[in-house]
């Protein structure tokens, strides 16, 4: 504080000296802090002038000190005014002012200090006196942001003092309260109470609700409890004063209304114009209880939806052109209310069309957006859960709308008198013919739009985190509520209630025709998918943020599925279109059934034509597994390789030698099943719940059912030995297909069992020993990888294979090598393909690996074999010799990655994908029992040759000789 702050009262005190107990009281003259501080502040003129000051940080600090220095609570009126000044300053300046006066931002937002410096929770607070408050109010006349509000407060203060005489004793308060209740009209449904007017300032006559203490922009546009608890006489006189300054309202952005203005209250006033005029003049104020204020606030919020309710009649009368209407959302003016409504519905209103998925409450402004959302199979978009506060408010408003439609006329507020309003020329009427504000009396009120009055408060936006804000009881509507979350049946508050169900919007005048087209398009796109596995589920796991916002523009249009037609029409359209809906729905159902049957037959024919010719060409030796028949087993790598070897040419070649595979009889029997039954079974099981086996019309309905019914059921990993569980199948499948997460489980299982899943692999090695036992294998440094271009729905596969030796190639070579069968991963490999296009994956991309292979101390480099621990017989040679049918495929055939099921157009793109994503599958430590995997041969060899890393491992098992 300044060193010389003298007292303004007639005393000899030259400098303010804070008291030891009460810091706001001077120890020398016993006068208060405000009496001294006013000596440093400019006294505004008594009569209002047009000259105002610019808000500056140092001036705001001086005025803030009048109410914050040495106090623990702020009067409500002064906090309103100070908020206006703070909103003009930067947030850093506001924080500096508060901290200099020993106030935190949380306490200032709350309006009082919660705990003292020692941490004790306060139960009583020091606050400035009423005389100091009046003196401080005058300082706010200096600024244009607060001048008009202070003038209204002064008028209210003057009339309150002239009308109400304070009681002399405390017992008279109860007597006066009872007597005032006796004179109250029976037409008012809510009990009102003036309380003890002498001991309570009208602006402190608020309900005990913390919502008023939060920053203004957290409400839309005003705390509901505050609206319901305002003294009516004050609000009426506020509007009267505002009506006398229309020109100032046009030019001054901050001076057209006080903070306590509200559109919802204005609309309720419209409904009260026909109230009986026999109500006594004593009913000039109302203090609503906590319980009633919430229900009233709910009604008041819902009245602000429609453009008719949002258009301010005073703005219409003050517009540049007579008859133009004003959109409060974007500040644009329009020729008439019809044009405004079209603009409002198209730009600002997003509540026209409800999602057709059962249980989803999302609503949209256009059918296209609604259909795009409804066709998305992601169940998280349709779950009846609280996505955020906006959706919660939307659902609450929807429930309130349905329950309050027929019991609206419960809340009325009677204005003291109903004469013509001075200062407004001409009558303003709404679209339904009811007078809007033309008959409000001299004490009537007009509440201008709060949006132009209340600026954005920067000091509330950035520094205050949600955790710092007060935990406020009661309903706290979020910002987007009134602009986008109220159903259409509340669009016009002043129209008769019996006419509400008949109101239709322009966009939904022909809903059946549009929905039929959307259903047909969705049905075509749904059947274009080959199987359910190809449909992206888009299920976001629980630990991932959901970035599918209710804004439907982000939903891909490719994921349309069949729309559900059982969803009832909105309340406003049900009565008018019930008969047409029934007829059209029946026709649609029949059309969809015929379309489904026709497309099923076409799919069956395609499936037959794709399977039968190949069986005839191969003489029945080659077995083809369609996409629907690929076994879903815990070890996809080994089992799929086994099935393809045994179902392909290798099985036929070995069978010609008289070797039998008794355990593969089941795979032979599968071939005798009718393709018609298989295709039909696949089609029926496409949309079947895996848990309860219920069938659904489309994938979206099935996913929604799974989330709503089986939400708590987890999906366990399909790999045996892995106990991981996931909340969604998509997360489970993504985890199960990642072999890097299951290397330990896979290798342990491979070592423990030789009869379970790998019997074919072990048997193949025994067969190789018997058939080629006279051949001597010469070890050489080489490593290859084989791509089998199979013809099943799974596409081609890639597997790491063991050593390939040049001597064995020469011994086995009874014919030319299969073209395109072997793709060399190493530049030092002795095996080359005849075709240059299939010779190598990347000659320079793996040069490091080829060089690293020569660094082995023992002269050879063992790759990961088909069966762990037994890797000396070149199975790839057997496969190349036996499966001649694989070589006949064209080189440009799309390649499917066996690990992630992605399809690539050529070897180049597949090679790049496999080496960058799945290369860890190729290089395993050579020490038996060590399951460490490496991305390069050099790293693997360096690890394998380090004995210190394998001390704890048991001795390696003997290899086959």
Swiss-Prot record:
Tissue specificity note: Epidermis and germ cells of testis and ovary.
Domain of life of the source: Eukaryota
Signal peptide start and end residues: none
Subcellular localization(s) per the UniProt record: Nucleus; Cytoplasm; Nucleus, Nucleoplasm
Subunit: Interacts with HSF2BP (via C-terminus).
Alphabetized UniProt keyword annotations: Cytoplasm, Differentiation, DNA-binding, Metal-binding, Nucleus, Phosphoprotein, Repeat, Spermatogenesis, Transcription, Transcription regulation, Zinc, Zinc-finger
Function text: Transcriptional activator. It is likely involved in the regulation of keratinocytes terminal differentiation in squamous epithelia and hair follicles. Required for the maintenance of spermatogenesis. It is involved in the positive regulation of oocyte maturation, probably acting through the control of BMP15 levels and regulation of AKT signaling cascade. May also play a role in the early development of embryos.
Coiled-coil region: none
Protein name: Zinc finger protein basonuclin-1
Any one Gene Ontology cellular component term annotated for this protein: cytoplasm
Chain residue ranges for the region called Hydrophobic: 210-219
Sequence segments annotated as region (Disordered): 370-393, 523-572, 810-864, 937-961
PROSITE patterns, per database record: ZINC_FINGER_C2H2_1, ZINC_FINGER_C2H2_2
Predominant place of localization: nucleus
GO molecular function terms attached to this record: DNA binding; zinc ion binding
Species of the source: Mus musculus (Mouse)
Extent of Acidic residues compositional bias: 531-547
Biased composition (Low complexity): 826-844
Disruption outcome: Viable, although fertility is severely reduced in both males and females. Males have significantly reduced testis size, with progressive degeneration of seminiferous epithelium and loss of germ cells from 8 weeks of age. Sperm motility is also reduced.
Basic and acidic residues composition bias: residue spans: 548-560
Record PTM text: Phosphorylation on Ser-505 and Ser-509 leads to cytoplasmic localization.
